[in-house]
Regions:
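Generic C-terminus detector
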Residues: 201-233
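Conserved residues at beta->alpha junctions
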Residues: 4, 24, 218
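Residues that form generic nucleotide/phosphate-binding pockets
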Residues: 178-185, 227-230
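Glycine-rich phosphate/adenylate-binding loop
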Residues: 9-19, 23-170, 175-180, 189-194
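Cytosolic Rossmann-like ligand/nucleotide-binding regulatory domains
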Residues: 185-209
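Conserved SAM/SAH-binding loop
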Residues: 1-8
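A structural detector for beta-sheet-dominated domains
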Residues: 121, 168-170, 198, 208, ...
Length: 233
């Protein structure tokens, strides 16, 4: 399917599905998938990787923690495939974990109840029990779910007369941590406690704690959203 992504399209694609395998490259889309899977009780296999590292976990609505529960327990990396690269074996290992769990589900076998975390370069594989990660107040899988990803999404608006696109992130930005990690990666960053300024592929970019992001030097929403997804998803 070639189309602009939105929750309505995802809901149509989700009809009659037995299991969803994560092949996405950003968390905005993953949270949509997570909430759709919770709402319609569809098992899905989360998987992501960057560099030589990867993570995978089978999410079963009503039984396991969902992605929103897990995210606070997983390593907080702002690196992406665009900023840090990725080696093919990490992709292949992540896909192997995901497809194995999908085959278990489709054949009636019980999937594992632990999060697989690996660094294939170092030869390290760990399995972390996930049961205690479940949040009873989670807005996606708790006692009173509201499925926030299906209600809100990042928006992009061209600012009149300023050759600038404003992106509004669904949540807040942790600017201090982001500035520190981007500096460690060699990026030129200014941070003063109130905002962060950097450059993304030649575009001066300003980020605010409330989730607003200004990308200067363009009026193209598609280009601005692409930069946002590359560096801050």
């Amino acid at each position: 399917v070639i189309d602009a992504f939105d929750p309505k399209l995802l809901s149509i694609l989700g009809e009659g599905v037995d299991v969803i395998i994560d092949g996405t490259d950003n968390f905005e889309t993953r949270f949509y998938v997570n909430d759709l899977a919770q709402k319609y009780r569809i098992p899905w296999i989360y998987g992501s990787c960057v560099g030589s590292c990867g993570v995978s976990f089978p999410i079963i609505p009503g039984e396991t923690p969902c992605l929103r529960c897990l995210i606070g327990h997983l390593p907080a990396y702002h690196a992406t495939c665009d900023t840090a690269g990725i080696i093919a074996p990490a992709v292949q290992m992540t896909a192997a974990y995901e497809t194995t769990e999908a085959l278990k589900l489709l054949s009636g076998e019980k999937p594992r109840d632990s999060v697989a975390v690996f660094d294939i370069w170092q030869g390290e594989h760990h399995f972390i029990k996930a049961g205690k990660m479940k949040n009873k107040d989670c807005p996606s899988c708790g006692g009173h779910p509201v499925y926030p990803a299906l209600q809100s999404q990042s928006s992009a608006d061209v600012l009149c007369g300023r050759d600038t696109v404003q992106i509004r992130h669904p949540g807040a930005f942790e600017l201090e941590n982001m500035a520190r990690e981007m500096k460690a990666g060699g990026a030129a960053v200014e941070y003063n406690g109130y905002l962060m300024i950097t450059a993304l592929e030649g575009h001066r970019t300003v980020l605010f704690p409330d989730g607003r992001m200004l990308i200067h030097g363009t009026k193209d929403k598609r280009e601005a959203r692409s930069l946002y997804q590359k560096y801050f998803q």
